[in-house]
Design a protein with these regions (language model features):
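Acidic/polar active-site rim loop that often engages polyanionic ligands
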Residues: 89-102, 124-126
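Short, glycine-/Ser/Thr-/acidic-enriched flexible segments
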Residues: 16, 44, 136-137, 188-189, ...
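Glycine-rich oxoanion-binding loops at beta->alpha junctions
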Residues: 17-71, 93, 101-110, 114
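N-terminal phosphate-binding or glycine-rich loops at protein starts, especially the Walker A/P-loop
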Residues: 1-16
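Accessory alpha-helical/coil subdomains and C-terminal extensions
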Residues: 8, 63-66, 71-75, 80-83, ...
Length: 257
């Protein structure tokens, strides 16, 4: 945008900033390739009436969102009162936006792989059972991909779709190897499982710290490419979401979310 001579402003705290018209001017000195968000985030839903007023004569609004926040961007894009071109950029560690690969997922998988390495060292060195709880309240994609990334170091992967007797499987792994590393989705209730095991289990819960790390090279390149492609597409099209490999109009996002 700046290369085209356009001024760039950022609304702070997600859609809360748009609702309250909290914004700041962006220049090159603001740009940082590290983790986190320069503008910060919130879980506030967009207030369409206030957003229409605060958008004013902005040409384009880039909404860097996960699945829930993208619904606010969608509602903005589909409101007839909004003249601004609404452009969604898929970004979430959970990769749970149907039909769209998002920025951040590969970084989260890579960070989880490091936690699995640590869990493996702890379990195998102390002949113990270690649970690693993977975040994701509505999607277990992180759990399954982390399992694939460190398959040789994991004895059990448990998601809501896992069938069978968890306890028996874990006990078998422990008896066979002398240790067990269990990667389990946050969506699973497992307190009963821990108390029913023959040995006391240890639990590692990295939580959302996995998203507060430097982006991996893949995500850094992906982010740069996605925003450039989104900008180019926005010159002739409006109201769409840019994923890693495709573009989805907001009107289609309405039908599947």
């Amino acid at each position: 945008e700046r290369n085209q001579g356009n001024k760039v402003h950022g609304f702070c705290d997600g859609f809360r900033g748009l609702n309250q018209n909290i914004k700041e001017y962006f220049d090159q000195e603001h740009i940082d390739d590290g983790p986190g968000s320069l503008l910060k985030t919130s879980y506030d839903y967009v207030d369409i009436d206030r957003a229409v007023k605060n958008l004013g004569d902005y040409d384009r609004l880039y909404c860097i969102c996960g699945n829930e926040s993208m619904k606010s961007a969608r509602d903005l894009a589909l409101d007839d009162r909004v003249d601004t071109n609404i452009i969604g950029i898929a970004k979430t560690i959970f990769n749970d936006m149907p039909g769209l690969e998002s920025i951040g997922f590969q970084t989260a998988v890579q960070e989880l792989a490091r936690y699995i390495d640590s869990a493996y060292i702890e379990a195998s060195s102390t002949n113990s059972i270690v649970f690693l709880e993977v975040p994701g309240r509505h999607n277990s994609g992180l759990t399954t991909h982390a399992g694939l990334a460190r398959n040789s170091k994991i004895t059990n992967v448990i998601t809501p779709s896992t069938r069978g007797d968890y306890r028996t499987s874990i006990e078998y792994s422990y008896g066979n190897r002398g240790y067990a590393v269990v990667v389990i989705s946050e969506m699973c209730e497992y307190d009963y499982l821990i108390t029913s095991l023959s040995v006391k289990a240890k639990v590692i819960t990295p939580g959302y710290l996995i998203g507060a790390v430097d982006p991996c090279t893949y995500d850094s390149i992906l982010a740069e490419r996605m925003v450039r492609e989104a900008f180019n597409h926005a010159q002739e099209h409006r109201d769409f979401i840019k994923g890693a490999t495709n573009i989805m109009p907001f009107k289609d996002y309405l039908r599947i979310v």
